[in-house]
Amino acid sequence: MANRPLDILNNALDTPVIVRLKGAREFRGELKGYDIHMNLVLDNAEELRDGEVVSKFSSVVIRGDNVVYVSP
């Protein structure tokens, strides 16, 4: 059972996640890595606006300061 936020991220490694950012931006992709600051690495990522894909990336790094939530 996950007791801490980083445990949840660890359990979500190599699985699809949705990451909501400040400014109503959203990314969907496979979580490949994270650190204690919640900086995230997503592979096969898509940037979403209003539920529509606006950009695709083979890999993206998201700064933890901008993360509102991560949904596994």
UniProtKB/Swiss-Prot annotation:
Keywords: Ribonucleoprotein. InterPro entries: Lsm7/SmG-like, LSM_dom_sf, Sm, Sm_dom_euk/arc, snRNP_Sm-like_arc. PROSITE patterns: SM. Gene3D superfamilies: 2.30.30.100. It comes from the Archaea. One of its GO terms (molecular function) is RNA binding. Residues 4-72 form the Sm domain. GO terms for cellular component: ribonucleoprotein complex. Belongs to the snRNP Sm proteins family. This is Putative snRNP Sm-like protein. It comes from Methanosarcina acetivorans (strain ATCC 35395 / DSM 2834 / JCM 12185 / C2A).
